[in-house]
A protein has these predicted regions:
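Mature extracytoplasmic/periplasmic regions of secreted or cell-envelope proteins
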Residues: 24-189
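Secretory targeting and sorting signals
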Residues: 1-29
Length: 189
């Protein structure tokens, strides 16, 4: 009885494996029907679609930031520099979008994904906050030349930050700001 079941199960499994390949062979060999065109790999198309969505999202965030009240509240010259940096970042994103649209392999999309991953929109938000702190301390630091030097260095370093700047670059700006605050704390104490 068990032998019969095993033989039957083997026959069914073999038929299940052979039937689809036999149908596929007859489908290709059918005369009169044109062969189906080859489609690009679905993974590349899906990766490209997701990359384009991610790029559009980052571009939208940059657009909102450039017209935000936080940026508009900065001093005019500082605001112009921050908006210029954001505009440059948006141009870089447009170049990346063109690269992604032209990508035809997984290697290309991986390289674009890596470049997009290193693109940090939040750097600009951090820059705005740091510059606002610098502007808030400038009046109190007017009498202390050492603090003024640190604040000027912090503002200059902050305005050099781009979307691809590292966290170490941001840390340098914060260190200048902390040094200025420490200098102000030492003079008032």
């Amino acid at each position: 009885m068990n032998t019969t079941r095993r033989i039957t199960a083997t026959a069914l499994a073999t038929a299940a494996l052979v039937a689809p390949s036999a149908l596929a062979a007859t489908a290709v060999a059918t005369p009169g029907k044109p062969a189906e065109p080859t489609k690009p790999a679905k993974t590349v198309k899906a990766q490209t679609k997701q990359l384009l969505k991610d790029i559009a999202g980052k571009d939208k965030r940059l657009d909102r930031l450039s017209t935000s009240t936080a940026v508009e509240a900065l001093a005019d010259d500082t605001e112009a520099e921050v908006v210029g940096n954001v505009t440059d970042a948006r141009a870089d994103l447009a170049d990346l979008r063109t690269t992604v649209e032209a990508a035809d392999s997984t290697v290309d999309t991986r390289a674009a994904r890596k470049e997009l991953h290193s693109f940090r929109v939040e750097n600009f938000r951090i820059v705005v906050n740091l510059v606002r702190k610098v502007e808030g301390l400038e009046e109190a630091a007017a009498a202390d030349p050492e603090a003024v030097t640190h604040l000027a260095a912090a503002e200059a370093a902050a305005l050099e930050i781009t979307a691809t700047s590292t966290k170490a670059d941001l840390r340098d700006v914060r260190d200048h700001l902390k040094a200025a605050q420490a200098e102000l704390g030492a003079t008032t104490a």
